[in-house]
């Protein structure tokens, strides 16, 4: 009888909600928090301070420690820190950038067994109206999920250095609070 009462009060998940939860639980370990600091020397004491410059989200590309993030997140950094979902932190080195595509590739030295690379998909079957999920760390809030749709395909936008980025997938989901 106790089991019946527990089941009666537990909320039922619709299939879409159950799928969202499953995707979130599967992908979250692959999402990382990226912080960018710059070194500044104080004028009078000449002490060197680490000043937070920015933060963002990235994902684990492979078990060799490669991380993909946005170029604007790491631009101008003297030091880049990666926080895994487990709370473990690692200093990262930039191994490649594409400012015109707003992409940066970072590398951390972490044991393979603690890294969870994100399985990659194929965008060929995307269509306007398809559901999308985004997991990020807005304003240093950890592991936020948002749901939206593909709004358009093949868009062109301007990068930080005013170059055109072609074939962009436009989505409608807000990750910020």
Q: Where are each of the predicted segments found?
A:
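Serine-dependent protease modules
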Residues: 1-177
